[in-house]
């Protein structure tokens, strides 16, 4: 749909979270036109991610309601605000929950992808000018992670958009907006896995499976996939896992099982769940002297991690990774190209597709462990 004459607001179908722990409601909201430095996009597809469910549960310390969730999408630019030069109407884009302005201290450092240009307001569910572009029956609706892909139309900061190849399949590349990029990037950018290294992946959701795929790309020697749901093992092996372990099959902690495989531990471990107890096991199963454990999963508000200091004194390293260390505007377009060439597999992640009206079913499938990613289409 093209908007030939831009009015001050347009109508948009959206799945709105009016309160925590309640089903999303499909309603027609008002979306204002983009202001300076902003872009109006029409989302064509969006994945449903565990992070959306985490916020909906009420456990997210930055969760605000009512809100349009969704942060793993792909769409087309409809209109641009004053000063926007990097995209134009008709361009195909992926919204970014991790912006890249290129000008803040973090971007200029070259050491991180954690741009802070819009971070403060984004964490409050607002646009950079501290207002919202969404409303319903005259009441403001908050944005989410700077993306809000559960609305057909959304307004996003220019610095939070990656321009991509218009030939890309949106049903698949939308997953590069979060889960797949997070997992693959953590392997290459955060852990820097080398050929022949051993890898253990705790949790085989989309992110964990993406870690497995990234480890295979890095030519890791042994890739151990760990999950309590053995139904995920077939796909893990398809992505490159050499071993699949179910902790419920053992009468001892999975950490000890891994130390039986190698008494000194695993070169790189990845926690992809958000469970602080698993985070400890992942660290303590890392190789003595040089092993590193990468925390990707997001734990609930107020939860803390712990271990004996001796685990770190003896050479293990604990690291965190956000969006796989990937710089969205400058690096994500190449990942889209890689997926189009088959170097990144995306299709196997999409286990279900459905229209927006059925989005609550997508959350049910996720909670029941019956899906890897459900993609919503508009």
UniProtKB/Swiss-Prot annotation:
Signal peptide: none annotated. Zn(2+) 2 binds at residues 101, 104, 107, 115. Its cofactor is Zn(2+). It comes from the Bacteria. GO terms for biological process: formaldehyde catabolic process. It catalyses: S-(hydroxymethyl)glutathione + NADP(+) = S-formylglutathione + NADPH + H(+); S-(hydroxymethyl)glutathione + NAD(+) = S-formylglutathione + NADH + H(+); a primary alcohol + NAD(+) = an aldehyde + NADH + H(+); a secondary alcohol + NAD(+) = a ketone + NADH + H(+). GO terms for cellular component: cytosol. Its EC number is 1.1.1.284, 1.1.1.1, 1.1.1.-. It is found in: Cytoplasm. It holds the Pfam family ADH_zinc_N. Binds 2 Zn(2+) ions per subunit. GO terms for molecular function: alcohol dehydrogenase (NAD+) activity; S-(hydroxymethyl)glutathione dehydrogenase (NAD+) activity; S-(hydroxymethyl)glutathione dehydrogenase (NADP+) activity; S-(hydroxymethyl)glutathione dehydrogenase [NAD(P)+] activity; S-nitrosoglutathione reductase (NADH) activity; zinc ion binding. Its main location: cytoplasm. InterPro entries: ADH-like_C (IPR013149), ADH-like_N (IPR013154), ADH_3 (IPR014183), ADH_Zn_CS (IPR002328), GroES-like_sf (IPR011032), NAD(P)-bd_dom_sf (IPR036291), PKS_ER (IPR020843). Zn(2+) 1 binds at residues 49, 71, 178. Gene3D superfamilies: Medium-chain alcohol dehydrogenases, catalytic domain, NAD(P)-binding Rossmann-like Domain. Keywords: Cytoplasm, Metal-binding, NAD, Oxidoreductase, Zinc. NCBIfam families: adh_III_F_hyde (TIGR02818). Has high formaldehyde dehydrogenase activity in the presence of glutathione and catalyzes the oxidation of normal alcohols in a reaction that is not GSH-dependent. In addition, hemithiolacetals other than those formed from GSH, including omega-thiol fatty acids, also are substrates. Also acts as a S-nitroso-glutathione reductase by catalyzing the NADH-dependent reduction of S-nitrosoglutathione. Belongs to the zinc-containing alcohol dehydrogenase family. Class-III subfamily. Homodimer. This is S-(hydroxymethyl)glutathione dehydrogenase. The gene is frmA.
């Amino acid at each position: 749909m093209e908007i030939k004459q831009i009015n001050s607001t347009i109508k948009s179908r959206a799945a709105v979270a009016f309160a925590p722990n309640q089903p999303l409601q499909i309603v027609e909201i008002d979306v204002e036109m983009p202001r300076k430095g902003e872009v109006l996009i029409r989302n064509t597809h969006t994945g449903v991610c565990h992070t959306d469910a985490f916020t909906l549960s009420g456990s997210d310390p930055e969760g605000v309601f009512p809100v349009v969730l969704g942060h793993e999408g792909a769409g087309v630019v409809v209109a641009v605000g004053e000063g926007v030069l990097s995209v134009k109407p008709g361009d195909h884009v992926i919204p970014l929950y991790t912006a890249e302005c290129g000008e803040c201290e973090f971007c200029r450092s070259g050491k991180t992808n954690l741009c802070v240009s819009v971070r403060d307001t984004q964490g409050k569910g607002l646009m950079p000018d501290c207002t919202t572009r969404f409303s319903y029956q005259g009441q403001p609706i908050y944005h989410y992670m700077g993306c809000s892909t559960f609305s057909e139309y959304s307004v996003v900061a220019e610095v939070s958009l990656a321009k991509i190849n218009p030939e890309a399949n949106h049903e698949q590349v939308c997953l590069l907006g979060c889960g797949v990029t997070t997992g693959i990037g953590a392997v290459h950018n955060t852990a820097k896995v080398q050929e022949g290294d051993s890898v253990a992946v705790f949790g085989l959701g989309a992110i964990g499976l993406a870690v497995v795929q990234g480890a295979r790309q890095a030519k890791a020697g042994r890739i151990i996939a760990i999950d309590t749901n053995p139904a995920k093992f077939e796909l893990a092996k398809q992505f490159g896992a050499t071993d699949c372990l179910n902790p419920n099959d053992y009468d001892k902690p999975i950490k000890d099982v891994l130390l039986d495989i190698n008494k000194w531990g695993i070169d790189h471990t990845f926690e992809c769940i958000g469970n602080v107890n698993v985070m400890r096991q992942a660290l303590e199963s890392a190789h003595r002297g040089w092993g590193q454990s990468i925390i990707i999963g997001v734990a609930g508000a107020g939860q803390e991690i712990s271990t004996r200091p001796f685990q770190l004194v003896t050479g293990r390293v604990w690291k965190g990774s956000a969006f796989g260390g990937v710089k969205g505007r400058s690096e994500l377009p190449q990942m889209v190209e890689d997926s189009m060439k088959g170097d990144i597999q995306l299709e196997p992640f999409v286990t279900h597709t459905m229209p927006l009206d059925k989005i609550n079913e997508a959350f049910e499938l996720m909670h029941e462990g019956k899906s890897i990613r459900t993609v919503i289409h508009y």
